[in-house]
């Protein structure tokens, strides 16, 4: 009998041909008609909380199940929102304000990935588990936020997404529907399906290089991306403070602070591009 993870992977793989064609028509990895000898590699990067920690973004502590001293069941589940929407809104209001403090800035790792995108153009895709906007502020544009975005909210009835930089109050409603509906954070909570999974799995099937940065390897489906990339022949790289739960799956590994190991690896990769020799 298939596990929940197995059911999800099976469902995502069913329509590969149609989704692959759709991905080719989008910006990501679209220039496959270039002769093979002239091609730049297709690089897919996955980032987790470890890349933003050095910018001052506090991370969820899986060991004790707390996030900013709150139980995740209370502030990061649909059931928690149903029980106490004001608590949940207050929690994300505080996170939203923190993200916009002047001391919270992209670090050297974010800037290095923006430099890598500049070199690769539309053969680069960044998938992040983070809900902050530090990648965009560093200059990345080809970004999929699989866990949502803190500076957005969505209608709890229609799902329409709105940019939102201030606090959300009980009086704030979405008026896209016939009757005003409550707003909720545009964040994927525990028990909800991550966003953009069709595109992510198609990109994994087309990537030449897969790089995971600052991830724990505890949370699926993201923890399974390295295995999926390997199935399709990608070279795999882990850049992390310490080995992740799936660290043994990677062909190449570098450990240390993200602000150190990411710029170093990007420089190595760019030198290889210029020399015509990529891992």
Swiss-Prot record:
The keyword S-adenosyl-L-methionine does not apply. Its EC number is 2.3.1.286. Substrate binds at residues 92, 95. Zn(2+) binds at residues 155, 174. Its main location: cytoplasm. Residues 20-272 form the Deacetylase sirtuin-type domain. NAD(+) binds at residues 48-67, 129-132, 214-216, 240-242, 258. Changing residue 92 to F: 42-fold decrease in desuccinylase activity. 3-fold decrease in deacetylase activity. One of its GO terms (biological process) is chemotaxis. GO terms for cellular component: cytoplasm. Deacetylation is inhibited by nicotinamide. The active site is at residue 147. Its cofactor is Zn(2+). Binds 1 zinc ion per subunit. 2 residues (Tyr-92 and Arg-95) present in a large hydrophobic pocket are probably involved in substrate specificity. They are important for desuccinylation activity, but dispensable for deacetylation activity. NAD-dependent lysine deacetylase that specifically removes acetyl groups on target proteins. Also acts as a protein-lysine deacylase by mediating protein desuccinylation and de-2-hydroxyisobutyrylation. Modulates the activities of several proteins which are inactive in their acylated form. Activates the enzyme acetyl-CoA synthetase (acs) by deacetylating 'Lys-609' in the inactive, acetylated form of the enzyme. May also modulate the activity of other propionyl-adenosine monophosphate (AMP)-forming enzymes. Forms a 1:1 complex with acetyl-CoA synthetase (Acs). This is NAD-dependent protein deacylase. It comes from Escherichia coli (strain K12). The lineage of its organism: Bacteria, Pseudomonadati, Pseudomonadota, Gammaproteobacteria, Enterobacterales.
